[in-house]
Amino acid sequence: MTSVSLTVDAVTKEFNRRSIFRDVSFSLRSGESLAITGRNGSGKSTLVKIICGLLSPTRGSLAYVVDDKSIEVDAIKDHIGLVSPYLQMYDEFTGLENLEVLSRIRADHDITDAVITDALKNVGLWERRNDYVRTYSSGMKQRLKYAFAMLHRPEVLILDEPTSNLDAEGIAMVERCVKEQSSRGMLIVATNDPEEATWCVQRVVLGSEKK
């Protein structure tokens, strides 16, 4: 089993000289979990993007180690599964076609037709696999994001607003994903929901919210 560790050291992010957050530090390894909490506008999604390598910090550093080897942040994407509001699927493709196309991004992983089938079944979309995503409800689109995020059994699963647009059945699906990830990999959850924060052992609070 691949082991991953992440060290975030005094990370600060500024936009137009305005500080979004300052001096965020934490460390995680496989089998550990972290909730990123804070009021709206405190920078939770921004921090998630930095952790994923989609944004660079203004100051501070991130260090990933995979199986005792240092990995550049840009290369960590192969080890990450991400679910977030800013991750978009292809409306002009079917649900199945989305996973087939997106699986090519994971070309270094053995993603077979059977793996894609299981992913769609696990999120309850198998019966709608041949429907265009533009006909999906917002909750179904969120489920499809989970299917893609879990497709390659990521060592690091990052969830930003994890139960957005989901009904009770969808939330139960998310909780199964969280339980599976917690048993074998690293889990990071960015949320305003106190219940979702309890999925994680550690917590980073952004903004003026108190621990």
Predicted features along the sequence, with ranges:
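Conserved structural motif at the start of ABC-family nucleotide-binding domains
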Residues: 6, 21-23
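Helix-to-loop junction immediately C-terminal to a conserved catalytic motif
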Residues: 52
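The feature captures the beta-strand-to-loop junction immediately N-terminal to the Walker
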Residues: 37-39
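Q-loop/switch helix immediately C-terminal to the Walker
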Residues: 86, 92-107
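Conserved ABC transporter NBD signature motif
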Residues: 60-71, 75-76
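Catalytic Walker B motif of ABC-type/P-loop ATPase nucleotide-binding domains
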Residues: 157-161
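Conserved ABC ATPase "signature" region
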Residues: 100, 104, 111-128
